């Protein structure tokens, strides 16, 4: 389910005139979703300023699509931020951005490959590594959206921790998480230019296929051939299926 969706130019204007958080909240209420509490509202006010800085770039077409708080089908999970369009050669891409306001994090244990410890909701908590979170969301969408397969749309997961202090970067880049940050890179406070270049590698033009987000949201929802192959692989003992958020945390703590 799409919550907020508009072209880049309008998103930039919504942030500039300080109406973005209200628009997201109104859209969530209209759709009857259980979200929009005070801390979440504040996070929209904060994080959208940083994302505006990334997309408000002359190399990114004004009509590229922006989506905020996309509710993943069949789950209660939401993708923080999506940029949808095409690259310089016309290849359709959707960049999935997991946003975090963390300032630092810690490795929980050397055998816990999904999780880190950080200060969230007024206490230290064990949560998913942001790269894993972004990657798992992209896998779930890819496995269940037939439109992505039919239209050859590429998903590009990543994470942006715009408050994260550089001296703690080595925690998130610890080799135990390499499997995740190699497929879903993360960017921190002092890596604005690097993150901007990453986005522009995949998104500079509007899609020739129209609104990719609408296409996915209203497309066929069924297990794709890739998911069927993954399930078959699980039967013979290979771990294929992606765990989401709390599932991954529980798996790490129990194994």
Predicted regions located by residue number:
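N-terminal pre-P-loop "Q-motif" helix
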Residues: 222-228, 236-255
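Short, structured interface segments
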Residues: 212-222
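Compositionally biased, low-complexity repeat tracts
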Residues: 215, 233-236
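Active-site-adjacent bridging/hinge elements
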Residues: 108-114, 220-232
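Accessory nucleic-acid engagement/destabilization modules that flank
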Residues: 1-214
């Amino acid at each position: 389910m799409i919550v907020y969706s508009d072209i880049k130019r309008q998103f930039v204007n919504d942030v500039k005139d300080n109406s973005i958080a209200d628009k997201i909240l109104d859209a969530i209420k209209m759709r009857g979703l259980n979200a929009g509490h005070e801390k979440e509202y504040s996070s929209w006010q904060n994080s959208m300023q940083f994302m505006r800085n990334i997309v408000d770039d002359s190399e990114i077409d004004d009509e590229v699509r922006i989506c905020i708080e996309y509710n993943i089908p069949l789950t209660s999970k939401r993708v923080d931020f999506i940029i949808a369009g095409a690259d310089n050669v016309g290849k359709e891409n959707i960049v999935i951005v997991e946003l975090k306001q963390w300032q630092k994090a810690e490795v929980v244990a050397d055998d816990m490959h999904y999780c880190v410890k950080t200060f969230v909701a007024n206490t230290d908590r064990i949560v998913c590594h942001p790269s894993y979170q972004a990657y798992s969301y992209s896998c779930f969408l890819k496995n269940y959206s037939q439109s992505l397969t039919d239209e050859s749309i590429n998903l590009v997961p990543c994470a942006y921790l715009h408050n994260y202090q550089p001296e703690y970067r080595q925690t998130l880049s610890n080799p135990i998480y390499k499997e995740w940050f190699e497929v879903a890179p993360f960017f921190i406070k002092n890596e604005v230019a690097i993150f901007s270049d990453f986005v522009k590698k995949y998104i500079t033009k509007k899609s020739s296929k129209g609104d990719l987000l609408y296409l996915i949201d209203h497309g066929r929802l069924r297990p794709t051939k890739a998911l069927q192959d993954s399930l078959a692989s699980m039967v013979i003992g290979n771990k294929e299926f992606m765990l989401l958020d709390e599932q991954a945390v529980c798996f790490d703590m129990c194994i």
